[in-house]
């Protein structure tokens, strides 16, 4: 099985909250697709709550589009990581980490501005596979923590696992 890019970085050295360019690729038509690692929690030390991350999934995707989409950037998808330490965001374009961090902070403020659970988009059995597994309170707690901590940048060069380590795993 091929080694995926996300498993070639040392998770023991990741900072959080932090933005990382996980991957960049060109399409056959010449557009650039960039995948960002939006790390909310330090791997193997913290985890996002099940209900909180699910509610963030519903809110974060729209709010990030509000703050990041432009003539040169279009978000394709924002999805939670299976390890529940953050989200992957795939987009067309090449925004800098600082631009992404600013959009992320603005989106977290938007999460804090949501008044009631009923205001969570697509919160119904037709549009959500586990529509009862949500908590606006937990999502807002996550948002407060991100805003209070600020957002750093993780760089692949600082986190890459050596070939020697990878061969031994």
Curated annotation (Swiss-Prot):
The keyword Lyase applies. GO terms for biological process: quorum sensing. Transmembrane segments: none annotated. Binds 1 Fe cation per subunit. It catalyses: S-(5-deoxy-D-ribos-5-yl)-L-homocysteine = (S)-4,5-dihydroxypentane-2,3-dione + L-homocysteine. Its EC number is 4.4.1.21. Its cofactor is Fe cation. Keywords: Autoinducer synthesis, Iron, Lyase, Metal-binding, Quorum sensing. It holds the Pfam family LuxS. One of its GO terms (molecular function) is S-ribosylhomocysteine lyase activity. The keyword Iron applies. Fe cation binds at residues 54, 58, 128. Belongs to the LuxS family. Involved in the synthesis of autoinducer 2 (AI-2) which is secreted by bacteria and is used to communicate both the cell density and the metabolic potential of the environment. The regulation of gene expression in response to changes in cell density is called quorum sensing. Catalyzes the transformation of S-ribosylhomocysteine (RHC) to homocysteine (HC) and 4,5-dihydroxy-2,3-pentadione (DPD). Homodimer. This is S-ribosylhomocysteine lyase.
């Amino acid at each position: 099985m091929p080694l995926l890019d996300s498993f070639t970085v040392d998770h023991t050295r990741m900072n959080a909250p932090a933005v990382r360019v996980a991957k960049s690729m060109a399409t056959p038509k010449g557009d650039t697709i960039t995948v960002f690692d939006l790390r909310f929690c330090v791997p193997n030390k913290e985890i996002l709550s099940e209900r909180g991350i699910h509610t963030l999934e519903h809110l974060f995707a729209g709010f990030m589009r509000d703050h990041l989409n432009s003539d040169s950037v279009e978000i394709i998808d924002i999805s939670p990581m299976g390890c529940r330490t953050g989200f992957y965001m795939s987009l067309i374009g090449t925004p800098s980490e600082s631009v992404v961090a600013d959009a992320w902070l603005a989106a977290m403020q938007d999460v804090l501005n949501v008044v009631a659970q009923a205001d969570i988009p697509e919160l119904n059995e037709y549009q959500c596979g586990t529509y009862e597994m949500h908590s606006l309170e937990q999502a807002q707690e996550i948002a407060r923590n991100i805003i209070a901590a600020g957002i750093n940048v993780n760089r692949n060069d600082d986190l890459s696992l050596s070939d020697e380590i990878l061969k031994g795993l």
